[in-house]
């Protein structure tokens, strides 16, 4: 039986899942992200799926960097469903058409489109003012400004030259500018409510 847990970026769902698991009432399957699979594998809650993986030739068709995460102690214990990034831009074409704006492919294009959408009396960016959503937008801005190489240097290698450089100053300046395109009711808004704003044509875009 399906069950959904509202709120947050999955934190509430994980709390409910852990409570059910330790009380002896786990669901038959659950969506778990990335390296959390290793934690659940260590707790002994996951089932060996090697027979299914062998029939589907997962080791042969799925990249090793993905299968490594899907395994615990050398055995498949999770199904690779998709690989999802956080810098996706979701857009409502009808809102762009109404504002005479073009769906952006860069941050600078985002600001141009955002100005046109604001001028049309619509909300450019549907956003929820929650820490994890703010971090999602920050990551997207940082990737655009820094590029992939310096992004890795900054946030994986913690390279101080990049972290304290002019491009990082630009990251924070553009991140601050993003708030010019968010409505005043944003604080505390759940992500799914922001998504509904895009679907219903109240807002043009969401970064998620």
Regions found by a protein language model. Name each.
Residues 72-81, 87, 111-160, 203:
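Extracytoplasmic/periplasmic solute-binding protein
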Residues 39, 172-208:
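Extracytoplasmic/periplasmic substrate-binding proteins
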Residues 13, 17, 37, 113-114, ...:
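Short, hydrophobic alpha-helical packing/hinge segments within bilobed ligand-binding/sensory domains
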